[in-house]
Amino acid sequence: MINIDDYKLGVEFAAEYKYGNIIPNGGLPYAAILMGVMFKHCRGMARIYCHGFKPELVCELPFWTEFCAYIRNPKNCLYALVDSTEWINERPMKLLKQLKEERSITEHVIEYKRRKEGKGNKKVKKEKDIIIPDTSIIVKQIHPDSAKMIAKRYGESIHFSVFDNEKFRYEYDSENYKAYGSFNQPDNCRYLIETFDQAFNDPASKIII
């Protein structure tokens, strides 16, 4: 692997000029660079399938800086599938939960229902608060059947992220953060998006944030 500073310059250059070449990506610090630059250049839609927003990666710079900047903008969307809830109380997931709660809307609803009373009906007033959840951030735990579907298509131990419709990072060895990516491959992104959306829209996938 090349010098980390040279690698960062190369990744920034590829992002700026939207090069479609494949970028090798392996090891935690290199993964943090590529993910950080992808968040930096994302225009508003990020799809993430990961183990569970592991803080050892997400909190590594520049990943953490760009991740925070992206999700703090309410115009940006982040949809995520996670295998595990092991890190739900760590910084990345706590921040996602906090932002979602802040953006959710509470509406006070008044309902009138008729209740049978004696020979007639009585009008009864009921008041309640309804929380309308924010939809710019949604994190689901993937259902095992959907995880098997992805493994059947792409192999075991893979995760991937797609930014907008043309940028992606495909991780084929999650334990060692070995991956590759590109800033301009819409055809490959289309297949990954179709796979992600199929799993994400599975009613059995549980919303956790």
Q: What does each model-found stretch correspond to?
A:
Residues M1-R47, H51-I209:
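PLD/PLD-like phosphodiesterase catalytic module centered on the HKD motif
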